[in-house]
Amino acid sequence: YLSELAGGKKKKESIFDAFKVFKDFKNYLGNAYLHFSEPIDLDTFLTNNVNENYSIDSPQEKPEWLESATGMLGDEVIRSINNSVAVTSTSLFSIALLTSTTQTMSEDDLIERINFFLTLIKDSSDYGQVWVTQTDIKGIISKTEKLGFISPTLIGSNKVYRPSSDEVATLSFYKNNISHLFILYSLICESVKFIRQVPKDEIIRLIEMIYPIFAKDFHLKTEKISQREIENAMQTLIQKGILNDEQENFIKAPEEDNFYYSNYIALSNLCEPSLKRFYIVMNAMWKSEAISKDDLKLKCKELAEHLEQIEGWPYPEFSDQAKFDNFVYAMKKTKYFKEDDLGNLSASIITKRAKNLYEQFFDKDFLDFIENQAN
């Protein structure tokens, strides 16, 4: 798993893999948390998504609706799991550390950052009731160390946390478990990162447009988002000093010397890799009238490999066939892509019209790089 997360090739599993973990039982294993989400009534689900007369008369029968209904049910299960996630110590530690631009933090800075993420959960209208398994911040850090996920370095009398590449891959698994709790905040922060100030209504329009693909990607509660939900999230960020609304009906990022600037950047960093992946794909689509899925994957993979050399972080979605297939499926479901009878893909008209809005998420260097590599 760690190899795949770092961009390596997918490895086959073996029956003998289970025996390799026996040595871990002598170590501290922490806690396992079991949390139940809302039950899904299958009869109601099929009635609503197929029709009242759905039926399968034998195990060999595969009606036309079965594949799509199974996919929708899978999405519903994952959404339910995410909505009832247990926020563990390791997840909080991981998201606090890995959203730092340098992925290096002192203990004091880490304590402040974990507390910031805890308050965002508490104030969230969607996820305020999720189970946070531990709120003592020093205990959160101590437990992550005890589990062996990271060892601090002492610089003078201060603890500094600087994970190795293997530790980053491990911690990323735990970070990803709770990233969805903060993705709306992250998108709002990213929308004002490269522009001096932005009208509130433009931010709302941009988030409404991009939200469906993130809802699919992160299995969020709903596939679409309302203006009120965006405004509430925006207001939460303003109250915490993460955004500035000094000028009426305009939003801007805090100044670099502002106390809250590092928290603002941490939130922005959370959605940035997914946004870049989205733009890499969309840029390839905009430059093609129609393109096969294999050709699209090849173009994106080549471009991402060049980007990896600059950024130092992989884009495994373009090297893993299953991940890429899932991504294309999500883009079709959210109507960003159209597919013709030959299986070729094309960008929907609305995405072409919104290209300038999407570019608001990125700095000029990234946009120039994508444009030059694509030509």
Predicted ranges, named:
Residues Y1-N375:
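Membrane-interfacial terminal anchoring regions of lipid-handling membrane enzymes
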